[in-house]
Amino acid sequence: MWTNFFKLRLFCCLLAVLMVVVLVVNVTQVEYLDHETVSATFIDSSGQFVSSQVTGISRNPYCGYDQQTLSSQERMEEDSLLAALHQQVPDVGPVPFVKSTDPSSSYFVILNSAAFFKVGSQLEVLVHVQDFQRKPKKYGGDYLQARIHSPKLQAGAVGRVVDYQNGFYKVFFTLLWPGKVKVSVSLVHPSEGIRVLQRLQEDKPDRVYFKSLFRSGRISETTECNVCLPGNLPLCNFTDLYTGEPWFCFKPKKLPCSSRITHFKGGYLKGLLTAAESAFFQSGVNIKMPINSSGPDWVTVIPRRIKETNNLELSQGSGTFPSGYYYKDQWRPRKFKMRQFNDPDNITECLQRKVVHLFGDSTIRQWFEYLTTFVPDLVEFNLGSPKNVGPFLAVDQKHNILLKYRCHGPPIRFTTVFSNELHYVANELNGIVGGKNTVVAIAVWSRFSTFPLEVYIRRLRNIRRAVVRLLDRSPKTVVVIRTANAQELGPEVSLFNSDWYNFQLDTILRRMFSGVGVYLVDAWEMTLAHYLPHKLHPDEVIVKNQLDMFLSFVCPLET
């Protein structure tokens, strides 16, 4: 009897242990399955957020910018933007280096250069490009930059380039100051190089790659992350639930996706070009090289009479080009009077009782750095944030000024950012009440140059929605957009941050925010028109002019 009872008790114990083991295995499987779930949030035609989930391991390459549901109006807008930019590059097949554009044998001619021009007159320049065999080219697609300038006056303005797709270009300038005015034209990239840049933009969105650190206890793993990940490995999906902005990381082998703690730039892919393609990207040969004039490269401009000057100012419409010009190193917008904030007290008076939000990349972080350096009463609080990353905060308690900076969400090329600090601008805007004492400035462009244009269009679409909502609930909120700017280029930098890429982004930004009710700081023209070398982070004199323009929107001259 006791023997049977002992056997029954042993059997029950074994059964209980077995049930516990099965339960643990099932819980583990459920947790593992949950971390492998690939989910995405899309936007339907009504503008509402629609969430979809696919349970299981993603085995196919996933590019988040392809997974969009757009309204018919959004689709038309995107198609129009892409068509306008893509048609600039002719498809002529492979071209040997000797038949590519040679800036040293190309030339420009000032039309009617012997005539005297008045301030406000149009100046036309004809550019003829030739190859390295000194033969005229029969197609266009070269990326040119042009400006007029008077060094002694520290004056400058940009020109509008028109490509006739036959090897000839025209540059149109508006002469905006009197005196001797010189013309400068540069070849940024030959059309053959532009075709390579376009291929990289479409086929190599991962040429700048990112990583994340995952950690749990003593176990840590690092995996690659991006908007688009190649291969068949399982993914962690970090797509934003509110905006639908896609972001993915390869799943760690041992850790769950929820253990991600940091985001950082991994590096730049090498070996992107063939030997033949590399010839189109040579410093001192065909990257940002001057094109010389055939004949005079300057004209004489005489002042207008006072009555003519008043008529000229009245005739300037909303589509004024250029938007402004430098004179004595001060930017002069053509559509309104810009104030000069030369004294810290002027800035303090303007920003008194205001909350200023700066969102975006490192080019708008320069604004935060300038203000906290120039205005002594703006005291920066140490939030323990990583250098150059943020978030940053400065306060002037006496005058009730609050200044904030926060970087935009991925892709962001900073060294290390805690994953919980990766905030999308659209989400931040949705949390702002707004009002007459609220100022918002946004600069989102420099980290999108390596991606297909659809990625940038999507980001701006989300930001635009949030801006419209903010202005609807608080119409007196001041919203300012800082545009892209030109920068220094070399053979390698051109493949990632070319001015041609940034010109595309700048064009998209201007069109998408046209008519929205925001102010524009034209950093693009303010960089190109200045005599200083181009830099991603412009020198202080240019930043100062940007801030003067920004503050003039916040505190305009009383009329």
UniProtKB/Swiss-Prot annotation:
Residues the record marks as carrying a glycan:
26, 237, 346
What's the gene?
NXPE3
Localization per record:
Secreted
- Keywords associated with the record: Glycoprotein, Secreted, Signal
What name goes with this protein? NXPE family member 3
Where does this protein chiefly localize?
Answer: secreted
- Extract the Gene3D superfamilies matched here: Immunoglobulins
| Signal peptide bounds | 1-30
One Pfam entry name:
NXPE4_C
